[in-house]
Every structure is written in structure tokens, then in C-alpha cells.
Amino acid sequence: KLTYDVAKTSTHGSDELAQIITDAYEQAGEFGVVSHERSYTDETYIKKVEGHPVEAGFTNEMYINNPTYQTCEFDNPMVLLSMNQIKDYNQIAPFIAKAFENNKRTPVVLFSEIDHHVENIILHNVSEFKFPICVVRLPAIGILQREIMNDLSLLFNCEILPSVPTVDFQGMEEKYIGNCKSIKIGANDVSFLKHDNFENDKVTGKINELNSQIKVNDSETEKIYLKKRVARLTGGIA
């Protein structure tokens, strides 16, 4: 009722807009984020992002496997996170081999900057052998990028690949392999769902930490950014 009353006042007494805003907050949940954008139709509507949103996208349209929606979609993929440019295919070869272990064809999603020679090898495998893989460009830059990637490492339950390109991953691949129930990758947005039985106390701890920072922060810009991080971790955004 309070949300509706505030929304009605903000929209100059519009019952319709007040109800839409109220519904959006209910759908986003306690820790979710509600934002607004210009509609390209005459309709005002709610668009809820299912799962955990990331402001990123595929690096090449050849990764698209759902032409209707122009997205790349995988169930139960192997996820790799790297803060550094992949300059040699051998840096990811052990994980590609892992994806094909025991005659499996596990989809691979790689969040990383990648040398064009390495990506050409990957795209050849996609084109010639229908290898299920997608390279996703890193979100944001600088400190913001590191914070987002650290959040993703909690949600995918894996470590970020080290910066040393000569590291031998043989026998220690598991700790760098993340996973999720499903993922949808577009040109400019990514969303994924965690497994139903996912539990990670570190995620809860990070959410509590961010909410504490929101309460004491005086900067509205910083608060918005922190709330987006909370929304990503909780999976609530409308």
C-alpha cells in the first residue's frame, strides 16, 4: 500500500502507472532493483529479467544458436572466468578437453578478453564441428570489472583463472570450472539461473556486506551501483 501511494503521488495521480510500479517492485523482490527505460511502443509494461543479469554480451554472432531471439543459450554449461586476455589457445585447451571427457559435449562459456587468433580457432570449431561454446566480453572496466567478476565467481562457484599464462592446469581444472543451470547470452546482455540446490554462504555474506554499505553511503550514484550488485547476486531485477 505504501509503495502504491508513493508511486501514485510520483505519477501525478495515475492509478494505472502506480499499479505498474507497485507490481514491478513486487516482482523484483526485497533486494531487487527496479529501473525504467523509454518504451518503443505505446504500451507501458514490466519486463522482468529472469535469473542473474550481467551487462555483457557475446563477442561474435557466430555463437548464436537461437536465431529467433538472436541469442546463445545453453543448459548446464561449464563456465570459465578470466580477467586477462587469452593469448594462447593452450591456456584454455585443458578445459576444452574436460568438456569432451567421456564422450560428453558440455557447453563452454568463457568470460574473457581474447586474442583474435585464439577466437578464430574457437570459431572454426563452432562452424566445422558445431562445438557448443560462447565467448563473452568482460563487463565494465577497471575496478568495477573486478568487482563484477568477483561476484560472478561466487555465483558460478569457481575461481578466476590466474593471470600467469604458463600455469599448468592439469589436474587442477575443477576449481576453475564454474557451472549454472542455464544461461542466455545476447549481444548486450547475459542472464543465468543457478542450480536449484545451489548453496553458497559467501553469496549471502556478500549480499549482507553490500546492503550495509548502501545504508551508510551518501552518494546516490554509488547506492545505485551497489543495489545493482545486490540485484545480480539475488537475481531480482525488473
What are these regions (language model features)?
Residues K1-A238:
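Long, structured protein-protein interaction/assembly regions in large complexes
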